[in-house]
Amino acid sequence: VNVTRIAEPAVSALAVFAAALVALPVFAIVVIAAQPAPDLWSHLLDYVLPQAVRDTAALLIGVGSVALLTGAGTAWLVSSHDFPGRGLLLWLLPLPLAIPTYIAAYVYVDLFEPLGLVHRTLTLWLPPRDALALLPSLRSLPGAILIVGIVLYPYVYLSARATFQLQSAEFAEAARTLGAGRWNVFRRISLPMARPALAVGLALVALETLNDIGASEYLGVRTLTVSIFTTWLNRGSLAGAAQLSCLVLVMVGGLIALERYGRRNAVTEFSSESPRLMPRTPFTGIKGWLAFAACALPVLLGFIVPLLFLLHQSVHRAPVTMDAAVWRDAFNSVTFATLATLVALGLGLATILATRWRPGGWRSFSANITQMGYALPGLVLALGLLAPVLAIDNALSTFASWLGLSQPGLVLMGSGAAVVTAYVIRFLAVPTGFLRAGFERIPFDYDDSARSAGAGQMTAMRRIHLPLLRPALLGAAIVVFVDCLKELPATLLLRPLNVETLATSIYQYASRGSFEDGALAALLIVAASIGPVAWLTRFSDIPQGPA
């Protein structure tokens, strides 16, 4: 009983701490942005903001369009039709999520640059100058739209496929009795019913696009996120960067509002208690192979081409890529990611336990606050953490001097604790979501039975909840760990001096124009990401009616 009396306040305190931790960078950004910087702001208004807002809006619209057309189209084909290779494509279509946007950008620029692989191949049949004229200009806004869109479309694909698979056959049959063809059924029935799922997928695509800095900067697109980075790095103005960050936060709020608007009046029930799911229509002959080609092309461009390039460069340049630095960077990445995963799981578990033990009120509010972190672009989050972290480091140094001890230096920044904190804030929504879904499958009767047997809340959690939550905990741990490995913006700003991770070392190689030397580091990130994507795909397929 004493343990229970201590446990509940402790868990509640951890839940409040988690919410406060997520809210801290937002609060800090607003406070820093309130500092006057008239000279810099006039410069931003005249020379930075117009292009940054224009490029950001164009990139969001363009990437969203590519992701919507590719994701919804392929999801409809594999959900509603049978054709050669469909079973394989079900597994392959989500795999571009394993390729970070910045790695995709580095790969394609390297492939299509003068004297790159594509140019050298074309010169086998064409004069060098004619071959050069055929190369597309990827360091441009259209290039960024295509590259980022082709690796982010699986967000739309996964959400749309889940909806298409669950649609009742009755709606399509009713439309066909009224003379509607297959295309009209898709346009007027299937697509509107999938609108809420498409809104969720597009919101994730937009948030990931806003978070990107590596691809946009490398491809010459001056987004708001890139402008924040250059304002802080080149002009040394934290206030100016914070003011630009506030604009990004407003944009994030607008995207979330649009996502909720897109999910309005969502159809959550079918016309009967056990709906008959829509059977798949067989595509044979040329139609089947065209469907296969339409689904295989995004996989080829978004996953297979980057993967083969990284494999080739890693083997071809093995003496350069397989040096001690890459393994040191891998160790740093794994260390930061492991620590962040453990802390995020602990805080996520405390947050959901607090709402289960006493639903509603401030506990539910705290749980909702923890979901904000994933919506924060990593660079904005890092800027918001920078001032509090440095303030704590300075306070520790002052306290050490007051005690007559030697100066400890930058404890949080120098140890990597700032990086781990940023990871926890950004990805805390993942374990919270996984564990909330896991707890929803555990009836409250189990808790009542444990109490009637004299077991306290901690005993029930240890003996009942945790064993049943193992799949949710494992899934959350895998996703958080890999997301931490891939995170570039926050790591770039908060990493300790002279410490690199796999993501930042790739960025440094690309900045020096020698991305091939970082191919093995990129390959390690991709290899670590394939497993979680395949794991998520395994649990997203739903049996349908016979073809």
Please provide the spans of the model-predicted regions.
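The alpha-helix within a helix-turn-helix
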Residues: 175-176, 450
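Membrane-water interface segments at the C-terminal ends of transmembrane alpha-helices
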Residues: 6-37, 45-165, 193-213, 241-260, ...
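Short, charged juxtamembrane terminal tails flanking transmembrane helices
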Residues: 3, 539-547
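ABC-family ATPase nucleotide-binding domain "signature/switch" substructure
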Residues: 448, 452-453, 463-464
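Feature of multi-pass inner-membrane transport and sensor proteins
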Residues: 122-123, 168-169, 184, 215, ...
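Short alpha-helical segment that forms part of, or immediately flanks, the ligand-binding pocket
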Residues: 172, 447-448
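Glycine-rich helix-loop "coupling/hinge" segments at transmembrane-helix boundaries
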Residues: 210-235, 486-515
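Polytopic alpha-helical membrane proteins, predominantly small-molecule transporters/carriers
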Residues: 53, 179-180, 188
